[in-house]
């Protein structure tokens, strides 16, 4: 599955680097320069942790615990989704994997169990929960350096263009307050855009 895909990609990258050096398209120093960058290793470690979280089902268990604790109403379910994203945000460096691979299937399952399906009564709960999930995913993607794959590129650009260095903790300190405000207000804000909410 995903392990084979990662192995194939890694092999392709290494073969590409080797061919680039052999054909003098780049020097060996240029080919290996990225391996000495701490941001690169931070992202590699985060992807390894993410693989473990997804493969072991830990992400799903975290989300279900949040739902168990907060999900007494549909708005509570919205907060459970936000809490799950907040916990998983710094650990899973792909917001697509986090949102689409962990959170979305759980949200879809909860929506269907409440009798809310895409073709049948989506406004009961599914519409609201999917909106919360999608927006919470984007908020947590911006909160942490490892929140999404593009953030390390932004960090590197800030260093190269402006001379400003964003490490993981600096990024988190800058993003935590606006992120928490966004996650706290999101379920209530989106509640007013939903036509009707049921209580469970």
What are these regions (language model features)?
Residues 7, 68, 72-75, 124-127, ...:
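Membrane-water interface of alpha-helical transmembrane segments
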Residues 2-3, 17-23, 45-50, 82-89, ...:
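Hydrophobic core segments of alpha-helical transmembrane domains in multi-pass membrane transport
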Residues 1-6, 199-200:
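Short, small-residue-biased leader/transition segments that mark boundaries at the very start
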Residues 95-99, 114-198:
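Juxtamembrane and boundary regions of transmembrane helices in multi-pass small-molecule transporters
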Residues 6, 33, 173:
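Phosphate-coordinating loops and pocket residues in cytosolic domains that bind phosphorylated ligands
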Residues 10-118:
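Membrane-embedded alpha-helical segments and adjacent helix-loop junctions characteristic
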Residues 8-11, 150:
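Catalytic-loop motifs flanking and including active-site residues across diverse enzymes
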